[in-house]
């Protein structure tokens, strides 16, 4: 179920070697843009920010996933708010965007709970599991987030 809502670049099935490669990749980054979600001293998910380039260099795209046993417990809402606060504080990024596949209603609700607003729907924008699907586009500005957490 997790892979159904992630980009195809996330390996499936996810092996121990995939995990080691990811840790090496994250360790080599100049800017902290990946956050591990830990529950009961176990890795339970990930939050990542992919900074834009050129004229979009003050933007970042948000990606995240959480292991299924932890769904519906408010963990992702809490962890996203914390990671976004940290990322905005330590970078000059002014805007974070997120793309959510049409069927992932829970993920849309999580984003809205922490202040993201839906900007539109890109129709048939993604090809996942052999099917074209709409992608819901969300954004959050640094100044809006600051006003929410005051």
Model-derived features with residue positions:
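A generic local structural motif
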Residues: 21-23, 124-125
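Acyl-donor (CoA/ACP) binding surface of acyl/acetyltransferases
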Residues: 1, 34-150
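A short, well-structured alpha-helix characteristic of acyl/acetyltransferase catalytic modules
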Residues: 1-20, 143-150
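Short loop/turn motifs at secondary-structure junctions and domain boundaries
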Residues: 25-31, 116
């Amino acid at each position: 179920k997790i892979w159904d809502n992630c980009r195809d670049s996330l390996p499936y099935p996810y092996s121990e070697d995939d995990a080691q490669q990811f840790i090496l990749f994250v360790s080599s980054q100049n800017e902290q843009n990946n956050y591990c979600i830990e529950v009961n001293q176990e890795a339970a998910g990930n939050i990542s920010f992919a900074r834009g380039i050129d004229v979009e260099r003050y933007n970042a795209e948000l990606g995240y996933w959480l292991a299924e046993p932890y769904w519906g417990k408010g963990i992702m809402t809490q962890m996203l708010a914390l990671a976004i606060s940290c990322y905005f504080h330590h970078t000059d990024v002014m805007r974070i965007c997120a793309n959510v596949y049409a069927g992932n209603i829970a993920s849309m609700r999580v984003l809205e709970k922490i202040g993201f607003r839906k900007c539109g729907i890109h129709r048939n924008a993604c090809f996942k599991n052999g099917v074209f699907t709409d992608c819901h586009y969300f954004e959050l500005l640094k100044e809006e987030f600051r006003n929410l957490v005051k």
